[in-house]
Amino acid sequence: MAVPKKRTSASKKRIRKNSWKGKGYGTALKAFSLGKSLSTGNSKSFFVPKNSLKVFKRIIKNWNNLNRLGSKN
């Protein structure tokens, strides 16, 4: 069975962890951006039923309200 000869350094662990987290953050940002463009009607590449646009708009409205409340504290 293969066993590593030396212990992985803390800095290398941190680099790998941050890289992994960064990928997730980028994906979440893209998803939020896509949802926002769909809700405003600026999307040119997706056809979305009207009732789901209402849901997206409600989500964006709630998100904006939460951001406003968070900035006051």
Swiss-Prot record:
The cross-references to Pfam families, in alphabetical order and at most eight, read: Ribosomal_L32p
Q: Where in the cell is it found?
A: Plastid, Chloroplast
The question of whether Ribonucleoprotein is a record keyword is answered with yes
Q: Which InterPro entries match?
A: Ribosomal_bL32, Ribosomal_bL32_plant/cyanobact, Ribosomal_zn-bd
**Keywords on record:** Chloroplast, Plastid, Ribonucleoprotein, Ribosomal protein
Chief subcellular location: plastid
GO CC entries: chloroplast; large ribosomal subunit
Protein name as it appears in the record: Large ribosomal subunit protein bL32c
